From Swiss-Prot:
Naturally occurring in which organism (per UniProt): Listeria monocytogenes serotype 4b (strain F2365)
Annotated protein name in UniProt: Alanine racemase
NCBIfam families the UniProt entry points to: alr
N6-(pyridoxal phosphate)lysine PTM sites in chain numbering: K40
Cofactor(s) for this UniProt protein: pyridoxal 5'-phosphate
Reactions performed catalytically: L-alanine = D-alanine
Function comment: Catalyzes the interconversion of L-alanine and D-alanine. May also act on other amino acids.
Pathway(s) where this gene product acts: Amino-acid biosynthesis; D-alanine biosynthesis; D-alanine from L-alanine: step 1/1
Molecular function via GO: alanine racemase activity; pyridoxal phosphate binding
The keyword Nucleus appears for this protein: no
Enzyme class label: isomerase
Amino acid sequence: MVTGWHRPTWIEIDRAAIRENIKNEQNKLPENVDLWAVVKANAYGHGIIEVARTAKEAGAKGFCVAILDEALALREAGFQDDFILVLGATRKEDANLAAKNHISLTVFREDWLEELTLEAPLRIHLKVDSGMGRLGIRTTDEARRIETTIAKDNQLQLEGIYTHFATADQLETSYFEQQLAKFQTILTSLKNRPTYVHTANSAASLLQPQIGFDAIRFGISMYGLTPSTEIKTSLPFELKPALALYTEMVHVKELAPGDSVSYGATYTATEREWVATLPIGYADGLIRHYSGFHVLVDGELAPIIGRVCMDQTIIKLPREFQTGSKVTIIGTDHGNTITADDAAHYLDTINYEVTCLLNERIPRKYIH
């Protein structure tokens, strides 16, 4: 995707916020527990390479990604000796590529290990489905069989075992406790404990520090976003959001009563009013459902009117502004703030989706 460096729409990523979130989390971890930075999905929309650099500077001991390509991108960017774990499924035919690049892979099927021809040692993390229902082995028998298969091949190493909690971001903990108990049953069934046992995502690491095991996978909260609104007031420290989204007015005009804007003419002025066109649209991740939401102009709320277009969006202004005036879509302006949580609430989704939708057509600028 082409990045729009010659368009006045941009994202600012505050590296100091990322560092502070990591440091605050590390301060509450036992000394022997590593923090791995989860940088999948372009670092949740924040930019994988720059975020990885920032996280490493702050003390992260490794990285988690979703797909092998993300791991390879980190290696190509200079992270040659860092621990990298692919959390998602990897094709069997790509095992050698991972092995040659010293990338750890998730395994959750016995048949995946059959007839592997490896040219370099491959490090495996066994995924346990303790109740998430996506990927993972579910019984002690499966775990022992896979452990035996790995032990027979001197090119395979069972480096880790892990699970993922479905309800760690909820205050009610009964299902979380069921998952933890199931995982521990499978863990204790192994003859040899792997080097890395890890279960905690952001929510679990914040609310359940006792289950840190050997490492935590610090994702959404590294970016200063709460795993869920339900636990926002129960967090052990204040999270600092790292992402802000800005644009500028490229056209300002006055509408007369009866004038309509955008596709479908869904918005019609009932009085004389000022509107501005913004150079951002659903092709950038500002999806059509943002229509009716608001932005900040000089610290004042300005509603998005009409339908969001592919490349442009129209807002109603509180008064006349000059072309080129700055507009805050996510972030703070003159003491007022629009958060990713605010957008998520309006869109009936979660803050993860809000930032992940912001694609690479919008340039990222890194500050602090």
